[in-house]
Amino acid sequence: MNPAHLLILAAVCVSPLGASSNRPMPLNLYQFKNMIQCTVPNRSWWHFADYGCYCGRGGSGTPVDDLDRCCQIHDNCYNEAEKISRCWPYFKTYSYECSQGTLTCKGGNNACAAAVCDCDRLAAICFAGAPYNDNNYNIDLKARCQ
């Protein structure tokens, strides 16, 4: 299977269209969800799963705003992490901690886990600093993300 298709498949696992509380999710995406909840406790993580052109499944075109740009940067960060031997970011778990809204990737992570943890940590911090525009949730990707 094409790696790009694998990434899209993994991203769809968190899509609110088919998500339920008992549906399995790749462990890394579960950790990323928890990081988002650490930095943005007042908004459910699934609000970020289908936002703009880059948050959630795939990504193309010009980001619609700063929050969408956070997701584009996160996608690019995962693409860089994939260059590490045997590193599959959507499935790589890592050690981190959340303390009072502050995320820290722990030192015991291998190169892949450290890279993926940092991608997720930086994205969660970026999400916390970017305004959320309800009009950019669940947009028409074909019309707005060319």
UniProtKB/Swiss-Prot annotation:
Q: What is this protein called?
A: Neutral phospholipase A2 muscarinic inhibitor
- So which tissues is this one expressed in? Expressed by the venom gland.
The record's comment on cofactor binding reads: Binds 1 Ca(2+) ion.
Q: Which reaction does it catalyse?
A: a 1,2-diacyl-sn-glycero-3-phosphocholine + H2O = a 1-acyl-sn-glycero-3-phosphocholine + a fatty acid + H(+)
**Keyword Secreted appears in the UniProt entry:** yes
Residues at the active site: H74, D120
* The protein's Enzyme Commission number: 3.1.1.4
The protein's predominant localisation is secreted
Compartments in which it is found = Secreted
Signal sequence segment: 1-21
Assembly with partners or alone: Monomer.
